[in-house]
Regions:
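Short clusters of hydrophobic/aromatic residues that line enzyme substrate/ligand-binding pockets
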Residues: 1, 77-81, 126
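Basic, Lys/Arg- and aromatic-enriched nucleic-acid-binding interface segment
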Residues: 1-45, 52-53, 84-86, 94, ...
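Generic secondary-structure boundary/loop-capping signal
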Residues: 4-5, 47, 60, 72, ...
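Conserved tyrosine-mediated DNA breakage-rejoining catalytic core shared by Y-recombinases
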Residues: 11-15, 45-108, 114-115
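Short, basic (Lys/Arg/His-rich) helix/loop patches that form interaction surfaces
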Residues: 14-25, 35, 89, 105-115, ...
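Surface-exposed charge patches
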Residues: 30, 97, 141, 145
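Flexible loop/turn segments at secondary-structure boundaries
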Residues: 38, 66-67, 134
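Residues in the helix-turn-helix
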Residues: 41, 56, 177
Length: 179
């Protein structure tokens, strides 16, 4: 049976945003729903991609999971899936606040954890409290469990990207601009 993609309405997204607060997947969900980012783009976001002064966010790095010699490994790339995926978007206030909060939390965690804090991913935004970069598969594995636990309509993490596109289109944004 072929999988049927589902999307969230604006109202369902509002419910999701309330429920997801404080969850480890919150940043990924917000970025996928607000900006239509792929999980590889969310995990690949680096601090130098955020221009707080000019209120812009550049999507230019990805982190993907691939099999190398029979072992699953993460591969960081300084490129996106397609040329048109490389884009600059406006930094909306809600995301700017979240990013500022995350930056402060990371600095605090680094002080508290001292030498135990992983310094391999200091340039990445989406890291855990010990400084390790969040894995792309975490989002697609954790998200469905979160929805079930909160009795919300089941969609795939990638469907947040489609929900974003549908809402943009419904609000008068052209298909070319969404693309």
């Amino acid at each position: 049976e072929k999988f049927k993609s589902e999307i969230y309405s604006g109202e369902e997204l509002e419910q999701l945003f309330k429920a997801i607060q404080g969850d480890p997947s919150e940043f990924g969900v917000i970025m996928a729903a607000f900006y239509g980012l792929r999980r590889s783009e969310v995990v690949g976001l680096k601090w130098d991609a955020i221009d707080f002064e000019n209120k812009k966010i550049s999507i230019q790095h990805t982190v993907v999971t691939a099999k190398v010699n029979g072992t699953l490994t993460e591969i960081a790339r300084d490129k996106t899936k397609t040329k048109s995926s490389c884009r600059t978007l406006p930094l909306i206030p809600a995301c700017e606040q979240m990013l500022n909060k995350m930056k402060k939390e990371q600095e605090q965690n680094r002080k508290v954890c001292g030498k135990s804090y992983c310094t391999d991913y200091l340039d990445y935004i989406y890291v855990d409290p010990m400084g390790k970069r969040i894995r792309p598969d975490f989002l697609s594995q954790h998200f469905p469990d979160f929805l079930v636990a909160h009795q919300m309509k089941r969609i795939r993490f990638h469907d947040l990207r489609h929900s974003c596109a549908s809402l943009l289109y419904a609000n008068g944004v052209s298909l070319k601009e969404i693309q």
